[in-house]
From Swiss-Prot:
Highest taxon listed in the record's lineage: Bacteria
Industrial or biotech use: Study of the performance of endoglucanase A on paper manufacture from agricultural fibers shows that treatment with the enzyme improves the properties of the pulp and the quality of paper. CelA treatment enhances the physical properties (stretch and tensile index) of paper from wheat straw, while dewatering properties are slightly diminished.
Catalyzed reaction equations: Endohydrolysis of (1->4)-beta-D-glucosidic linkages in cellulose, lichenin and cereal beta-D-glucans
Annotated protein name in UniProt: Endoglucanase A
Regulation affecting activity: Strongly inhibited by Hg(2+), Ag(+) and Fe(3+). To a lesser extent, is also inhibited by Pb(2+), Mn(2+), Sn(2+) and Cu(2+). By contrast, Ni(2+), Zn(2+), Co(2+), Ba(2+) and NH(4)(+) do not affect enzyme activity, while 10 mM Ca(2+), and Mg(2+) produce a stimulating effect. Is also strongly inhibited by chemicals such as N-bromosuccinimide and dimethyl(2-dihydroxy-5-nitrobenzyl)sulphonium bromide. Is not affected by N-acetylimidazole.
EC number, as in UniProt: 3.2.1.4
Source species of the chain: Paenibacillus barcinonensis
Thermal properties of activity per the entry: Optimum temperature is 40 degrees Celsius. Shows 98% and 51% of its maximum activity at 45 and 55 degrees Celsius, respectively.
Enzyme class label: hydrolase
pH-dependence of activity, as noted: Optimum pH is 4.0. Highly stable at acid pH. Retains 100% of its activity after 90 minutes incubation at pH 4.5 and 45 degrees Celsius, and 95% of the initial activity is found after 15 days incubation at room temperature and pH 4.5.
Recorded name of the encoding gene: celA
Length: 400
């Protein structure tokens, strides 16, 4: 997601390279012996409620990733420890590559950037958390240097580049166990919000298939790793409906996996109703049956809609053995317009997580690190403190 962020003119690329210079040669002690073969139900239960380390490793300056360029400080182990202590079991780490990808034909990813990604992964992985890493801003039309475009005429070049980048990333992490999950992409679509173009959707499906095949062929634990793939723009309706989504085949996975079990997960995001969750104004500040002011409550997207959306993912995928990860959900702070807003944000968060648990989905809260008006943050990343304990409590209550 890049819908809500604040950019500040602070630490530049020189600072990033100073920070990452010490990470060269960073390695992990993970081994193939660590890999557990979990069923869909088991891994969903273990992943619990998740949290996004948003607007950091996907943040960019003119197409070059820079983790502090959107106003957040350098990521520290202390932040991750605080997130774990709050009760979260999974951390999703959005990652952009963009200008850190070299030229054809090798498309070599900058080594210092890979080292930094690995170090941040290890902050969470070494705490016993589940970790999800993806390819995030590379597919956003609005990001300078983005290239993973379903509506581009240059699909052969895109697919070759995509395959080679994921090959490098997967190889780097091939020894990590089942607690590391790769996600093929983020909110990829053609840039307009009409129904999906069938041809473009076919390109998205091709990316997902390339991703699965490439990761599996890198060996190590990757032939049995859980892999996460989205449909069009991570939209639930466009993923479950008759719009063209195809679950990738998994022909190169380990033969040790029981044939009745899957190792593919499906990704979707939930920000409905958007006028409550994301619009940066004070028009809609309340949500749900307990709203006290009908004029401040959206005319759609309430409890019944939430239930029907998550049930559709359950019916389409969970019943067939595919875990579903709601990789982003949340609502921005509008308390400057309505002092009761944070209470309704908590009501919303609890409803989303409780409904996810009801339908055996994994809910992952979107935190962009920004506190205050229009921010999604639950934590202050500068001093590693909790800023929205009521929303965290609501999330954890929803998972009970």
């Amino acid at each position: 997601m890049t819908k809500t962020f604040k950019k500040f003119s602070i630490a530049g690329l020189a600072l990033l390279f100073m920070a990452t210079a010490a990470f060269a040669g960073w390695s992990t002690k993970a081994s193939a012996a660590d890999m557990r073969s979990l069923t869909a139900a088991q891994i969903t239960a273990e992943m619990g409620a998740g949290w996004n380390l948003g607007n950091q490793l996907e943040a960019t300056v003119n197409g070059t990733p820079n983790e502090t360029s959107w106003g957040n400080p350098t990521i520290t182990p202390e932040l991750i420890k605080k997130v774990k202590a709050a009760g979260f079991k999974t951390i999703r780490i959005p990652v952009s590559y963009l200008n850190y990808i070299g030229s054809a034909p090798n498309y070599t990813v900058n080594a210092s950037w890979l080292n930094r990604i690995q170090q941040v992964v290890d902050y969470a992985y070494n705490e016993g958390l589940y970790v999800v890493i993806n390819m995030h801003g590379d597919g956003f039309h609005s990001i300078p240097g983005s290239w993973l475009h379903v509506n581009s005429s240059n699909q052969n070049v895109i697919r070759d580049k995509y395959q080679k980048v994921w090959q490098q990333v997967a190889t780097r992490f091939s020894a990590y166990n089942e607690r590391l999950i790769f996600e093929s992409m983020n909110e990829v679509f053609d840039g307009n919000y009409n129904n999906p173009n069938t041809s473009y959707y076919g390109n998205l499906n091709a990316y997902n298939q390339i991703f699965v095949d490439t990761v599996r062929k890198t060996g190590g634990n990757n032939n049995a790793r859980w892999l996460l793939v989205p449909g069009w723009n991570t939209n639930i309706d466009y993923t479950v409906g008759n719009y063209g989504f195809v679950v990738p085949t998994d022909n190169f996975r380990s033969s040790a996996i029981p044939s009745s079990q899957k190792r593919i997960m499906i990704s979707a995001h939930y920000y409905s109703p958007w006028d409550f969750a994301g619009e940066e104004n004070g028009n809609i500040t309340q949500w749900g049956a307990t709203a006290t002011n009908p004029a401040k409550r959206s005319t759609w997207g309430q409890e019944d809609y939430l239930d029907s959306q998550f049930k559709s993912m359950y019916d389409k995928f969970v019943t067939q053995g595919y875990p579903v990860v709601m990789g982003e959900f949340g609502s921005i702070d509008k308390s400057s317009y309505d002092s009761s807003n944070n209470n309704y944000r908590a009501v919303y968060a609890k409803a989303v997580t409780a409904t996810a648990k009801k339908y055996k989905l994994v809910p992952v809260y979107w935190d962009n690190g920004f506190n205050g008006q229009h921010g999604f943050a639950l934590f202050n990343r500068f001093n590693n403190t909790v800023t929205q304990q009521n929303i965290i409590n609501a999330i954890m209550q929803g998972m009970q």
